[in-house]
Amino acid sequence: MLYEINRRVDWVLVGGRWTRVSVIGTDLFNETLDEIRDNIGNRVVILMIPGNPGNDGFYADFGQKILKCLLLRDERVGNRKRHYLFYTVSHLNHVVLPNELKNSGKHRHYDLFKLDDQVQHKLDFVREQLPMAQKVYILGHSIGAYMMLR
């Protein structure tokens, strides 16, 4: 069976600061994403914390390949009821803010953030934005692995 794996990129407030987030999955309509925040079901969430330069787009191909492998494995073993979501959260100010967001939120596009600020930002993302799931896997690349361990 063929699955269409899509990627959606949004700007969301995390700890009052605008953050670019991408989510990859097979069903990314607004209604579905709102529904899945409240209903755990057979959801598996994979959170990717990037290394530098901290851009979510760098992991788009990686996330799609992971989901494709998981879906093919589920099909092979006869388990087609899991709903996988692959989230990647950018680091603060590592992605250019859109013009319409530059003067809103708690930070400005020229603010600098220390490593501890970035770690707190990822914790805030998990608490505020990441949907609940049966299983959550956290992956980190380079400095993202360090943040994950903190």
Name each model-derived stretch.
Residues N55-F62, L115-Q118, K122, G144:
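Alpha-helical interaction elements in eukaryotic regulators
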Residues N103-D116:
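Catalytic nucleophile-loop/oxyanion-hole region of alpha/beta-hydrolase
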Residues L139-G144, M148:
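Gly/Ala-rich beta-loop-alpha elbow adjacent to hydrolase catalytic centers
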Residues M1-L13, S22:
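An N-terminal hydrophobic leader/cap segment in hydrolases
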Residues V44-V45, K135-Y137:
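Structural motif
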Residues G15-N103:
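Short, surface-exposed "cap/lid" segments of acyl-processing enzymes
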